[in-house]
Amino acid sequence: MQKFTFFVSCAKGIELLLKDELERLGISSQEKLAGVEFEGSIKDAYKVCIYSYLASQVMLKVATDKVINQQDLYEFISSINWMDYFAVDKTFKIIISGKHYDFNNTMFVSQKTKDAIVDQFRNVTNQRPNIDTENPDNVIKLHLHKQFVNVFLCLNIDSLHKRSYRQFQGQAPLKESLAAAILIKAGWLEELKKHQPILIDPMCGSGTILIEAALMAKNIAPVLLNKEFKIFNSKFHNQELWDNLLEIAKNSQKVTNAIICGFDIDNNVLDKAQRNIYQAGVEDVITVKRQDIRDLENEFESEGLIVTNPPYGERLYGDQLDELLDIFNGFGNRLSQDFYGWKVAVLTSFADSIKEMQLRTTERNKFYNGAIETILYQFEINEHAKFKHETQLEKNIRIAEASAQKSDEHIDFANKLKKNLKSLKPWLKQTGLECYRLYDADIPTFAVAVDVYSEHIFLQEYRADATIDQNIAKQRFYQAIYQIHKTLDIKYENIHTRVRQRQKGKEQYQKENDKNKFHIINEFDAKFYVNFDDYLDTGIFLDHRKIRQLVAKAAKNKTLLNLFSYTCTASVHAALKGAKTTSVDMSNTYLEWGKNNFTLNNIDAKKHSFIQADCISWLKTNKDKFDVIFLDPPTFSNSKRMDDILDIQRDHELLINLAMDSLKKDGILYFSNNYRRFKMSPQILEKFNCENIDKICLSRDFLSNKNIHNCWEIKYK
């Protein structure tokens, strides 16, 4: 059976759940952003269309290429043999998603794609297929990402999340696929393995969670409820196979003894829920009735699962915030008093309501209901559940919000962030960089550095002068956190903080925390692991971006010695250009991190050398010669692992001489340090050809801090 590559899209946040769902269908897939990808047959793809509760679109991958202008786009689309995919008498429509650096108008992309397809058919058959935006035979999807265009052929014409049962809905509807996702995440599939599974939704609204739970309990394939479902009319479509699989799905439904109950205080939405339940054909397992959540009672003989998506106040309470918070406080009390042993999951974007429940969460997961970001809070009702606990993050948020009310001087900081971002945008678009310095103590009263790492912020507070009131300094720091959250639209949990001060000895290598959470970032053609929480620095020095490129270019297909290599980022860039690298550092932790960076970039770390050693001692005994050496020592170090204290101003002459002893006669030594008052030794200037390359190595985002480092290119005379 012919194999294809398929991408199955879903709402952001449920990718892993979708991957697990496909595993249960016997399909192995890879998790991607907003979906999963798998290699398989048309039959496999049909199974996803029929049985998936979580998928939005099942798409056959047609082609991917880099395009930089409209002619490129036209030629790329024309290079695809569309007659292999559908006949000229079949209609189609085009949908566009994502963003492209060079195409701001998606209508233009759609028109150019349509022209290329139609022209191809006309040139070969003297006929052209027609566009049908309402009821097409086929849907072609283009996903734009940076300068790449990915082309897909959709198997399902309309989104799979539509089940057709929801004829009547409230003001804040929950997508069917998201309802299914939170049920699965909350443990409903495990609950169904019990003799008598129990599910309660105490704020059921129009009944979406109840119905999705019943469909799973009765093993009803979601596609069977979608009366308007239409499979693609491609040359790859096998109608007989599709019909057979649908028949198998119909015969796989089962009787269940699950108890599924819904409650709501609003009779109007309960009436809608009842009609939706009948529409779905699951009235035999669901009961609904009017009840205030504050009066919720446990009338069941065994423990079960409570899953709910509260109305956030839009539907019932409007701006009556106090009333809404009282409801959640009462809900929390009822749970702790009468539902011992139960598991609870609450999906909401209103965090204050969760605080009012005064229950300890066991897990939190981010989901998206359309564009609305929500959190699924999970609880286990036991003797430890009733606990009013403020996490460090919650404390930081509380202090930040309060600090913002104490003065308005942080408005200048916010305006500077906006101005800097506007100034950097053209350069960021040109380079494609996602990690950069946005702010560096531009306003003296806000002595912080703001580094952007895609959706994360690394906020470094410069140690305040002894003459500055520490309380005022602390207040300004929290005001900075508040404005980064508000102005840059960064989630509080993605703002990571540090106080910059001189580190001594082993402090330079010790962990700050032990969260052990790594993130992947991109820098040009390389990827790196960064850690915002556990170490003093993140794992990459953004100000060394340009010198890393110089080193990599010079070391292309040559040998590189990287001294004080840290996490080996320069070595990775060089290795990607064919260099054979040797990285030397005192810290085994950072060398292991470096090896992981090599692996992340699909580079065989075994073909490169990683040496844990004091660089000075190692250089004294090294006999090998290298084409390029990158020497980037710390300003000061008195680590016990070193034979002596390192002071870069005092010791740079020794370091450079030792490094030059390991350099080939026609080689290049790149020397860098961050000591602001650094002066190059006259003896070194006399002995070697030394060129200061500070300006060359200064990136656009560090222009406001021109003394951030000293960079030299050194060669033999």
Swiss-Prot record:
GO terms for cellular component: cytoplasm. Belongs to the methyltransferase superfamily. RlmKL family. SMART domains: THUMP (SM00981). It is found in: Cytoplasm. Its main location: cytoplasm. HAMAP family: 23SrRNA_methyltr_KL. The keyword S-adenosyl-L-methionine applies. This is Ribosomal RNA large subunit methyltransferase K/L. Its EC number is 2.1.1.173, 2.1.1.264. Keywords: Cytoplasm, Methyltransferase, RNA-binding, rRNA processing, S-adenosyl-L-methionine, Transferase. Residues 44-155 form the THUMP domain. Specifically methylates the guanine in position 2445 (m2G2445) and the guanine in position 2069 (m7G2069) of 23S rRNA. Transmembrane segments: none annotated. SUPFAM superfamilies: S-adenosyl-L-methionine-dependent methyltransferases. GO terms for molecular function: 23S rRNA (guanine(2445)-N(2))-methyltransferase activity; RNA binding; rRNA (guanine-N7-)-methyltransferase activity. It is an enzyme of class 2 (transferase). It comes from the Bacteria. Coiled coil: none annotated. Pfam families: Methyltrans_SAM, RlmL_1st, THUMP, UPF0020. It comes from Francisella tularensis subsp. tularensis (strain SCHU S4 / Schu 4). It catalyses: guanosine(2445) in 23S rRNA + S-adenosyl-L-methionine = N(2)-methylguanosine(2445) in 23S rRNA + S-adenosyl-L-homocysteine + H(+); guanosine(2069) in 23S rRNA + S-adenosyl-L-methionine = N(2)-methylguanosine(2069) in 23S rRNA + S-adenosyl-L-homocysteine + H(+).
